[in-house]
Regions:
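Glycine-rich and small/hydrophobic secondary-structure elements
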Residues: 165-167
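Polar, glycine-rich mid-to-C-terminal structural blocks
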Residues: 1-34, 42
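Glycine-rich phosphate/pyrophosphate-binding loops
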Residues: 158-161
């Protein structure tokens, strides 16, 4: 129920003070109505940061828009600036039956993502030096899925049904 200082991202100066509860309610209302903003508890992220990032003296300061990627940025233990880079892709579950029995499929997709990272490292202009350095050090890639609802519709499986939960 205390006051919350709204600070300038440029100089940290307090621009306005408002009731913290009011701010929290506005955030939650916007989240319910629009799906945004995404909320990241950065202190928790940094407490759980992988050991090799801790040893490099790195911290996560931000994430991508949807908050599924939290990679460290800043100056590492070798004195080099890092700009986080991650190559993401999604498998479309609408086409799951076409690739589900191929034991090599996911490995091939991951190799493709790594090849995209190599291509970025080789082709990025000098202005992207910090991103190239980070890409070379981390080679961060991510693979997710999309189209679950479409797949269930194809198979006449009601969303939320027992069948959808055991699939």
């Amino acid at each position: 129920d205390g006051q919350w200082a709204l600070r300038s991202p440029y100089d940290g100066s307090v621009q306005q003070t408002i009731p913290a509860r009011n701010l929290w309610i506005r955030l939650l209302t916007a989240r319910i109505e629009t799906g945004e903003p995404y909320i990241v508890y950065i202190d928790t992220v940094n407490r759980q940061i992988p050991q090799h990032h801790k040893l490099a003296g790195l911290k996560v300061k931000t994430s991508n828009l949807c908050s599924e990627i939290t990679l460290p940025t800043g100056i590492d233990n070798e004195g080099n600036q890092r700009t986080a880079v991650c190559c993401l892709s999604s498998l479309n579950l609408d086409t799951y039956d076409q690739w589900k029995d191929d034991p090599q499929f996911v490995e091939d997709v991951m190799r493709f993502l790594d090849n995209v990272m190599t291509d970025f490292i080789n082709r990025a202009p000098d202005e992207f030096a910090h991103a190239k350095y980070s890409a070379m050090r981390e080679r961060s890639v991510g693979l997710g899925v999309m189209g679950l609802h479409s797949y269930f519709q194809q198979k006449n499986i009601p969303f939320g049904s027992v069948m959808s939960k055991v699939w």
